[in-house]
Amino acid sequence: MRTEIENYVKKIEQSLELLWRSLDVEASTERLNALEELTADPSLWNDQANAQKLLREKSNLEEKLNAFNKLKSNLKDALELEEMAEAENDLETLSQIEQDLKNLSIIAAKFETECLFSGEADGNNCFLEINAGAGGTESHDWASIMMRMYLRFAERLGFKTEIINMINGEEAGIKSCTIRIIGKRAYGWFKTETGVHRLVRISPFNAAGKRMTSFASSWVYPEIDDNIAITIEDKDLRIDTFRASGAGGQHVNTTDSAVRITHIPTGTVTQCQSDRSQHKNKAQAMKMLQAKLYELEMQKRTDSVNEQNATKTDNSWGHQIRSYVLQPYHMVKDLRTDYETSDTKGVLDGDLEEFVSANLAMNVGGKK
């Protein structure tokens, strides 16, 4: 028990040290004090846009510094309680302290990852699209496995999800789906998942039990809020309505409530059929279009930088980012960071935090 407690304490202390540097606690505290003075001045609201910007910055700094101080305080309290429990040989209390420190180390690791979020839209909700690759039923099944993996990942992080659009495969799985992920920093957690995913396994659809390779792609883009301006002109849009697809039965939708919107200049398409109301589906499809166009613009900027660094293909939407091998051995490997694990079951059940953390760490300077 003593060894486990020491290990958890070491992990938390390492996280606190990294967070101290990442947050630049002293400078952030000084900036927060300055912002408190600025936002207390009534004349600030003469420029509402600037006032809102400063209030967002203040709120963000307060949240991060409060979380850091709470983490530090909780560790201090646990260590003091442990010292008393050790002196009294109180095994029950020591066992509870071990569990508390384990939970605290998980919180610290998550906070450490979130401090790597630096993008304008990292705090927003997001959309996740999954599309099966060539290969029919095999790829359709792989796409459905990926959908479950990401739904479980969102659940692990405490996010809510909505399936906005889904097209089933003929025999099994799905051809495509769009999921809305709702929660603070959802885009920050999911944004590195854009790319092509490769699965190697013994096919459940092949009578000869052959080993098969399947591909599916994912694309993540942030939901746009009022703080990010995206201009879309009506003349650039083509809006089509159609009957929502489904398995039939008494609840089958017999009206043209599904909506597809095409942005003609870019060829970008979004569609929604999750609601029986055409009006609501149109509003959701429009929100998705804004998000896609924002992500395309961000990708253009990224590509421009990558061209200068000769690494453009590493960030291309079509680039293979991860392989999942279930036969002849078990291994999931991220091809960008080289991070890998043999816990394929855990990964497919949504355990993706380490993959995300490794990617974010690499993006701010070196592989983790």
Curated annotation (Swiss-Prot):
Record's keyword annotation contains Cytoplasm: yes
GO cellular component, one term: cytoplasm
Protein name, as recorded: Peptide chain release factor 2
PROSITE patterns associated with the record: RF_PROK_I (PS00745)
Molecular-function GO term, any one: translation release factor activity, codon specific
Record PTM text: Methylated by PrmC. Methylation increases the termination efficiency of RF2.
A Pfam short name: RF-1
Coiled-coil stretches: none
Principal location class: cytoplasm
Family indicated by similarity: Belongs to the prokaryotic/mitochondrial release factor family.
Assigned keywords, A-Z: Cytoplasm, Methylation, Protein biosynthesis
Cellular compartments annotated: Cytoplasm
Role this protein plays: Peptide chain release factor 2 directs the termination of translation in response to the peptide chain termination codons UGA and UAA.
N5-methylglutamine found at: Q250
Organism, as annotated: Rickettsia africae (strain ESF-5)
Listed PANTHER family: CLASS I PEPTIDE CHAIN RELEASE FACTOR, PEPTIDE CHAIN RELEASE FACTOR 2
